[in-house]
């Protein structure tokens, strides 16, 4: 097979009209036929998402691949710790096996923090022996994000044992240290962490990159750090990569890494520096089996019409055309439905918050959700009371939030949250990072109970209720994913998202994605686990009441 076009060489920063000869999935020969020819298509390496949780797309790897290739993505660096928290090592193996049914190049990591903390109930544990077993697999390319950065700084034995194993297997170690700066950041880096995708200010990113860390610029459905961090690309092009981290199917339909390429170019960044971040750096850092348009490389590349819009015309993986003009050629595959879900329906009274009538001038701690960020703030408000019950107050945008243990029957943990903007009803989800218990937010206990029970009855899913209306997107695989065609799921999710905004009143850009992170204790400041309200600064439980 032969393909011709203006070939971008990311190593010598040139564009020459060339002809590729492809044999047995590899580039056998590159013939340079002259200088760049305006009007002819351009050939460049495929895009790589340098850090993503496939599960957060709500799709199996096979279905994720179908959507991603349309946008020129040929590979991902994928941390399977979401399903790992539900099913353990078996979940990681499930992701590997499902991904191998497609030509897409998934590089999975060995989850380093399952469960993420000891302050929540997960469905499984991935210990040191499990990490050793996973790192020994050829499909496992790295030790996935070390979220327990306090454990690194204090040299927790289990944490250090996992890091030591990764070094012994000569596999990179991903970091995760939001807000860590200065000497502590240096100690974290010195321990072996090579990347961070959690920087949310330019100053934090600059501090870490100057200390030798690779910075992954994240733009997902909930966390959006592109605007703050993209200036780093100018001075540190060899240390920057692009990633989505968590991307819901509706936004994956719209675009992927190609969107970040367009945005960076629109800001005036150098073409080859941008493509280095989007294509080259992840392949080199993680030693991915992904071609970079050199003789002998796997024939992984994309064809675009121009270098401004980067509209992807064709995507090739191992010499096979997997997408053309917006249509995926990756097969629509069904997958095995594995799960772990064992809790009973709840009653409205289970979500009641009682106040001691003898308490003087009470106040409640309130989680402040921040649109476009995973971090939260801790606020304090006077409670709204009905017969010694603290209730949600939609007029002040003070809603109830709950986390319900899905692995065993237990009393729900209940607290209060601001900035969801709901005027009525409730949302619930079995996608609740990282342990994936059921998490819900709502305006009244009856609605919260209805939304939670829809998820319980389906053994996983996203739900929204108001008045007599009830909507559900089932997620039968680990309570996280579905193997339904990704385009169909994207429409279902879009309809659910619109209901949450137009009917319930949510003011967030991505209410379900934001909700899913309100139980992620390793991101400060105030979060909720199935065991109670958690202060991410002091790293301990705290009371709903402040006085």
Where are these regions (language model features)?
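Short coil/turn connectors at secondary-structure junctions
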Residues: 1, 38-39, 43-45, 71-74, ...
